[in-house]
Amino acid sequence: MSLTQADKTDAIINAFYDVYNELGYGFIENVYQNALYRELLRRDIPCVAHPKINVYYKDEVVGYYEADIIVYNSVILELKAVTRLSKEHELQLVNYLKATDIEVGLLLNFGPKPEISRKVFSHYYRERLQNNSESAASALSVSKK
């Protein structure tokens, strides 16, 4: 039986809450990352910790980032241990999604109160952004003539 994206994110969120309830607030991010990774494995949820993801600019690798955890090969987890999630944290996750073929990301904060933010970046929007960029570039080259 194939899991839906909602089933996958529910399983991840349940593991997140188990780790949060066990450890509580106050540890550094790496402790939570290791604990969540182990909890996902314990539940037989396929995941990879710290995978390096190439970032491309015009089909050339210009750098990479290291994701915290990728689950089911279809959900990026970005973990934080901060007082409160910020817009910058959300943008970081969206950029990670843009750099991959993965469309769903979860921002999980092990703060004073557990916080979860779900982000989706569809390939449809990626293609639309690329088409808009190409249209803008065409318009610029036409106007320069």
Q: Where on the chain are the PLM-derived regions?
A:
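A short acidic/basic microdomain associated with nuclease active sites
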Residues: 41-59
